[in-house]
Design a protein with these regions (language model features):
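Conserved C-terminal active-site "lid" loop/helix of NAD(P)H-dependent oxidoreductases
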Residues: 198, 228, 254-281
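Glycine/proline-rich active-site loop of Rossmann-fold NAD(P)-dependent oxidoreductases
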Residues: 158-171, 207-218
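A conserved pocket-lining segment of Rossmann-fold NAD(P)-dependent short-chain dehydrogenase/reductase
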Residues: 172-196, 204
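NAD(P)-cofactor binding segment of oxidoreductase domains
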Residues: 57, 61-112
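Conserved beta-loop-beta element that borders a ligand/cofactor-binding pocket
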Residues: 136-161
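Amphipathic terminal alpha-helices
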Residues: 285-303
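N-terminal Rossmann NAD(P)H-binding glycine-rich loop of SDR-like oxidoreductase domains
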Residues: 3-25
C-alpha cells in the first residue's frame, strides 16, 4: 500500500511512518523544508516538499496513494478540506489525528469522575470546537465513499521512532520543574488524564488502516494518572524528590500559554473501548517507568 503522511517529520506521523515502512508499505511524507526532505529520504520516505496550507498538492497527491494519514495539525480545517476534496468518491482511506483534550473542561487542577468512550456524547470547550467539527466532517465523509477514520490519543509519552523522538506535554512540565526548582501542576494537580505509549499509538494507526470500518472513531489510552502523580514521578527522575507545588491557573497560563487550561489543568479520562474491540493490545512501557527509568531519565535525568 502507498500512504501519504502529513506530519511525517513529527512525533506521531514519524512513528507511524516508520512502522508503515517496516510493514512493507511505501510512504510519501510532507516536508516543509529542504532539511525535512533530506531527513525523510534518509528514512526511505519519499518527500513531498510544500506548505501545509498548499491546496493543490494535497488534492493531487491523493490520486497517487491508497491511503492518507493526517498527523500534521488537528485544528487545521483547510488541510482536512483539501484532503477530503481529493478523496471523496474514491473509497480510499483517510485517518485523521485528533486528541482526547476535546473532552476536557476548565477544571483548573481539580478532579472529575466523568469518563468518555467513543460513544459518550460531550460538548467541547470553545478552543476545541474547531477540532471536533473537523473530526465530524471527516467521519461524515464515510457517506461519500471515503474510508474515514478518526483517532484521538490521550497524553502520549515515550521515545518516538521517527524523525522526531520527543513528546509534547511531559517535556514542558520538565522545563517548568527546572525553571522553578520544583515540579508544578495546575492547581492541586488532582485532575486526571489518560495516557498511551507512542509505540502503541503507532500500532493502533496500522491496525485501523488494516481493519477499521469507514466512519470509525477510536480513543487511544492505556491507563490514567493525576497530574500530581505525574509531576511527582518527574521530580524523582530529576532528583527533586516527591515534593510538588500547586500552580495557580493564572500563573500557569503565563508559563505555559493558553494550553494550560485544557492540556494541563483539565480532566481527560477516556476509554478506548472500540480500539480494544478492533484487536488493539497496548504493550508499551508504563508511564512512571518510562519517566523514571526510560527515555526521560536518559535525556533529562540527573547526570
Amino acid at each position: 500500500m502507498k500512504v501519504f503522511v502529513t506530519g511525517a517529520t513529527g512525533y506521531i506521523g514519524g512513528s507511524v511512518s516508520t512502522r508503515l515502512l517496516e510493514q512493507g508499505h511505501e510512504v510519501i511524507g510532507l516536508a516543509r523544508s529542504a532539511e525535512a526532505a533530506v531527513a525523510l529520504k534518509k528514512r526511505g520516505i519519499e518527500p513531498l516538499t510544500g506548505d501545509i496550507n498548499a491546496y493543490t498538492p494535497f488534492v493531487e497527491v491523493v490520486k497517487r496513494v491508497d491511503a492518507v494519514i493526517n498527523a500534521a495539525n488537528s485544528d487545521n480545517a483547510f488541510v482536512a478540506h483539501a484532503l477530503l476534496t481529493g478523496l471523496r468518491g474514491t473509497g480510499k482511506t483517510l485517518i485523521q489525528t485528533s486528541g482526547s483534550s476535546v473532552v476536557g473542561t476548565y477544571d483548573n487542577g481539580e478532579a472529575s469522575d466523568d469518563t468518555f468512550d467513543e460513544d459518550t456524547p460531550f460538548t467541547p470547550q470553545p478552543e476545541k470546537a474547531m477540532r471536533v467539527a473537523i473530526d465530524h466532517a471527516v467521519l461524515a465523509a464515510a457517506k461519500e465513499n471515503v474510508r474515514a477514520i478518526v483517532i484521538r490519543p490521550a497524553l502520549i509519552y515515550g521515545r518516538g521512532i521517527g524523525v522526531s523522538s520527543t513528546s509534547v506535554q511531559l517535556p514542558k512540565l520538565i522545563d517548568v520543574a527546572r525553571k522553578h526548582g520544583v515540579p508544578r501542576h495546575v492547581g492541586r494537580g488532582l485532575n486526571i488524564w489518560g495516557h498511551v505509549h507512542i509505540e502503541d499509538v503507532a500500532a493502533l494507526y496500522l491496525l485501523a488502516l488494516e481493519k477499521a470500518s469507514a466512519g470509525s472513531l477510536f480513543y487511544a489510552e492505556n491507563g490514567e494518572a493525576s497530574f500530581k502523580s505525574v509531576t511527582q514521578s518527574l521530580g524523582r527522575m530529576l532528583g527533586m524528590g516527591d515534593r510538588t507545588q500547586d500552580w495557580p491557573i493564572g500563573e500557569a497560563v503565563e508559563g505555559l500559554g493558553p494550553g494550560a487550561y485544557l492540556s494541563f489543568g483539565s480532566n481527560s479520562r477516556v476509554r478506548a473501548k472500540r480500539s480494544r474491540a478492533l484487536g488493539w493490545q497496548p504493550k508499551g512501557r508504563a508511564l512512571t517507568d518510562e519517566i523514571e527509568n526510560g527515555v526521560y531519565a536518559e535525556v533529562y535525568g540527573r547526570k
